[in-house]
A protein has these predicted regions:
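Nuclease catalytic cores that cleave nucleic-acid phosphodiester bonds
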Residues: 2-4, 11-127
Length: 127
């Protein structure tokens, strides 16, 4: 299972002051995703391949063991759609985490499953 996370959408789903430090908020999300790489997510047992898609002010977030970071040159949604298409071409099941309805429509056209931000925010993010 490939878990593709729309970082901007997931970080923005909780009004916790993320707008003051987008990179820091995205790094906290990245760190929380490490557990999902080992344990799995939303009915999909681990291990899973976790891909965090970043853009804008969070483009410089570095990967960590268990979480691959993909920085979008332009639209994060376009990159997520491309990654979902690659997963389909590779025959890899894919779950995209976002609340963005249009993005959900685009990735399901590639056969991806979708889940909301709560799927990966079940635990408090590290501070």
């Amino acid at each position: 299972m490939r878990l593709i996370v729309d970082a901007a959408n997931v970080v923005g789903s909780v009004p916790d002051g993320w707008w003051r430090d987008r990179q820091g908020a995205t790094e906290r999300l990245r760190d929380a995703l490490v557990a999902h790489a080992a344990e799995g997510v939303s009915g999909h047992p681990g291990p899973v391949e976790v891909v965090l898609v970043v853009e804008g002010a969070a483009r410089d977030v570095a990967p960590v063991a268990g979480v691959r970071v993909e920085a979008a040159d332009g639209s994060g949604d376009d990159l997520i759609t491309e990654l979902a298409g690659r997963a389909a071409a590779d025959g890899v099941p894919c779950l995209v985490v976002t609340a963005d309805r249009e993005l959900r429509r685009r990735v399901t056209a590639h056969g991806a499953l979708c889940a909301g931000p709560r799927t990966v925010r079940r635990r408090p993010l590290p501070s």
